[in-house]
Structures are given as structure tokens and as C-alpha cells.
Amino acid sequence: MRLAIFDTNLYVGHWERALYQDRWDALHRAYVVRQSAVVLSELRRGARTRDAQQLVEDLRRIAPVVWEPTPADWWEAGKLVRKIGDAEGWDRDKRRDFQNDALIALTARRHGATVVTADVTDFGLLSREIRISVLPIR
């Protein structure tokens, strides 16, 4: 049984722009998809319309399992954000956004799951620092 976390950008692209239609069903057949508390929070934060809010609420409601970062994940995320952010010369805003990606990656790693994402750049940087499986979707 292969496990996966879909990154926020996959849901947004699929719901708002009908992206990834050809791969959506195949991904669900290939993986048991688990929800990340971080992804659900990002989706809820960005849901501006009633329809979008309902989609996010439905996703949370039907999720049999929601994976959350542990205190150790938060601790390691701080180190990763500092190290990668310093190397890349990022400002505070970019570092804050990247922290969520680090938390998603660390949660996936702990469960042996693949992160499915359109954010090839940030998860590529993370995969150089920690052992995670990333499936890029374009």
C-alpha cells in the first residue's frame, strides 16, 4: 500500500483550474491519499467563496485520517527553514511560507508517504536535505 499526501497546490489547481484531470484518478488508484493538517489549514485559509469553503469542509469531513506534524517535526522544520533560507537568501515571508512545505515533507517522511506536488522547486530543496519521496506534477 503506497501512501501519499497531496500538496495544497494540487487541490487548488484541480478545483479552480481543472488541472491534473488526466492524472487525478490515476493518482488515487496508485496511492492511498492521506490528508495533512497543514494542507487542510492552507486550503481553509484560502477558501474565499462559499463553494470553495464547502469543498474544503467536505475534504476534511471525509478524510479517514489526518496526519499532523509532531513537536519534533516543528523543531526540525525550524532548522530546515533556517538552513535552506540562508542558503537561498530568502526574506521572512518566503521562510514563513516554506515552513509549511517543510512540515508537510516531514510528516510525509514519518509515515513513509510520497508528497505529490506541483511545487517542484521547494520540495526539490527539501529532498536534498531530508529523505523524502516527491512526485512532481506539472
Predicted feature residues:
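Alpha-helix capping/helix-boundary segments
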Residues: 10-11, 39, 73, 103-104, ...
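Phosphate- and divalent-cation-binding pockets in alpha/beta enzyme and binding domains
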Residues: 42, 76, 125-126
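Short, hinge-like loop/turn segments at secondary-structure boundaries
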Residues: 50-54, 84-85, 133-136
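Active-site neighborhoods of divalent-metal-dependent phosphate/nucleic-acid chemistry enzymes
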Residues: 65-114, 118
